[in-house]
Amino acid sequence: LDDGSFQIPTKDNFRYANVFIHEIGHALGLKHPFEEPSPSGKVASPPYLESDENMSIWTQMSYSGEKKSYEFSPLDIAALQYLYGVESTVNSGDTVYVYNELKSNFIWDGGGVDTIDASSSSQPVTIFLSPGYHGFKGLTKKYELITSPGQITVNFGTQIENLVGSRFSDVLTGNDLNNTLIGDKGSDVIDGGAGVDTVVFDFDRIDATLDQIIEYKSKDGNVEIVRAWRIISGQHTDTIRNIERLKFKDSNVALDINGNAGKIVKLLSALLGADEAMNKAYIGIGLTSLDSGMSFESLMKAGLEFVLGSNPDSENVVNLFYENLVGSVAPESIVKKYSELIDLGELTPTDLGIAVAEHNITASNINLVGLVETGIEYI
């Protein structure tokens, strides 16, 4: 079928070897992209591709265009990955995919921690990390065809972690992973989606103003209140949604007060007292642990061992948590009651620590309500 020279028999611009690729495509579940009957008289069910995409350069299932390659075309690959997933051994390292505004961009990847980089774009970009979305150059208008220049999509089955925007005002949207999103210059609109997401800035925290805003969103006939943030620096204002971490040049800010950030400061208050709950280094260590998958219970246990050592005396445990909660020495009756529960195995020191961390008094001690408005700095 192929002697390596490409000088092989053809008919109607079809190399005979392409017939096998075409028929293998059918066997794998691909259909014709056009409405006209095949030579056997069969008509593919809709939807169909536009004429500009009904070409062999985009799909081997087309009858149009000269077929010069012995491999599936971009739309074939996207459809097959939707059906069967991505080959995990291909592009399995930490790969950087550079956005090309002169060509279409079909992103597919087998593994690793990967990045889409649009920093060299001469125009703003609108890019989504979730598979199947239609990204494009510009902010408000996309080409009708995903195969047009500057269009970008992540194929189904591919997970991309990081995204770098252009030097203009971009719209960047993450996926369900823990994303790192870099808007670069301009006034960007950034939405992290699910996961613990980080936005990186190229200026110091002291040079930025953080303003929380309330937005109203309609969903299933109901109106939801959504919190967003504006990060103002110089003449640029970034609007961010569903972002848990802000990384400045000199420090970081955690915004998820109802998530891991809130858990850490409550844990530190229970273990070390309210004054130490804002220790930036301790907060950073705790966030790294929880964001990496460590449970709150395991972190509380580790923290208690750090403060009191392994297998601490039950009375010392009660005294520690009571004083950090109330601010005074525990009464003997309290010490007796809870130390006996610990000694009898009916209450663990970790359980007591969690109860103290989640107590309303702890929330008041660390001004948890106020932290919702400012975020929590850490290093």
Task: Please give the residue ranges for each predicted region.
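Substrate/cofactor-recognition hotspot
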Residues: 244-379
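Short, composition-biased motifs enriched in small/polar/acidic residues
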Residues: 210-218
